[in-house]
């Protein structure tokens, strides 16, 4: 059975931490592919500072060297807010017999019960969680306790041994884009004058 990992994010910009956790995701779960899904209009984040087209181009450039990585614009071309459940449905239709895995950080796990159709989502896809420094499963909201306990036991939720890097795209933009960005994406940023102060 084919195993496909889905990795959504604003990727504004994509950085080495994203690539590191995507490789760990692929290695630890034994994925055939990791599909990066730059968001169009995420309902739970502030507007991105680079256009969707620029973010898509940067992700394509940054992921080109790993044959396991693919990029989809499905969340960009959809009109309106994009929800994870809808994205997973698109991949479920394209790959009906594949085992789907959704990658999220522990910060997202703590808010999962607020996501649109979260209970249906977790029936459609397995979840891989990258823990952020300082986060603990003991902090999980009460609304998720029963589901998380069962899911950790049956293997439909896996905690990755590789931690999330404590660097964010926001910090990279504030500090000035240079370190921590894959070279091809950094070149694109310079050539297109993105994130200039």
UniProtKB/Swiss-Prot annotation:
The keyword NAD applies. It comes from the Bacteria. GO terms for molecular function: ATP binding; nicotinate-nucleotide adenylyltransferase activity. It is an enzyme of class 2 (transferase). Pfam families: CTP_transf_like (PF01467). Keywords: ATP-binding, NAD, Nucleotide-binding, Nucleotidyltransferase, Pyridine nucleotide biosynthesis, Transferase. CDD domains: NMNAT (cd02165). Its EC number is 2.7.7.18. GO terms for biological process: NAD biosynthetic process. Pathway: Cofactor biosynthesis; NAD(+) biosynthesis; deamido-NAD(+) from nicotinate D-ribonucleotide: step 1/1. InterPro entries: Cyt_trans-like, NadD/NMNAT, Rossmann-like_a/b/a_fold. It catalyses: nicotinate beta-D-ribonucleotide + ATP + H(+) = deamido-NAD(+) + diphosphate. Catalyzes the reversible adenylation of nicotinate mononucleotide (NaMN) to nicotinic acid adenine dinucleotide (NaAD). Belongs to the NadD family. This is Probable nicotinate-nucleotide adenylyltransferase. It comes from Neisseria meningitidis serogroup A / serotype 4A (strain DSM 15465 / Z2491). The gene is nadD.
């Amino acid at each position: 059975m084919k195993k496909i990992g889905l990795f959504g994010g604003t990727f504004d910009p994509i950085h080495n931490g994203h690539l590191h956790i995507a490789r760990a995701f692929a290695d630890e779960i034994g994925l055939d592919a990791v599909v990066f899904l730059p968001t169009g209009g995420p309902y739970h984040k502030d507007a991105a500072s680079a256009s969707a087209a620029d973010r898509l181009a940067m992700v394509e450039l940054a992921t080109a060297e790993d044959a396991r990585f693919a990029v989809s614009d499905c969340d960009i071309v959809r009109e309106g807010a994009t929800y994870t459940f809808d994205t997973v449905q698109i991949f479920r239709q394209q790959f009906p017999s594949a085992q789907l895995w959704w990658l999220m950080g522990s910060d997202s796990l703590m808010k999962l019960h607020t996501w649109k159709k979260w209970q249906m989502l977790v029936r459609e896809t397995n979840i891989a969680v990258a823990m952020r420094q300082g986060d603990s499963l003991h902090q999980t909201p009460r609304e998720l306790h029963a589901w998380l306990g069962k899911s950790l036991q049956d293997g439909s939720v896996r905690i990755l041994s590789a931690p999330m890097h404590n660097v964010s795209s926001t910090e990279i933009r504030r500090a000035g884009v240079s370190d921590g960005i894959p070279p091809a994406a950094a070149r694109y940023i310079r050539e297109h004058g993105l994130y200039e102060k």
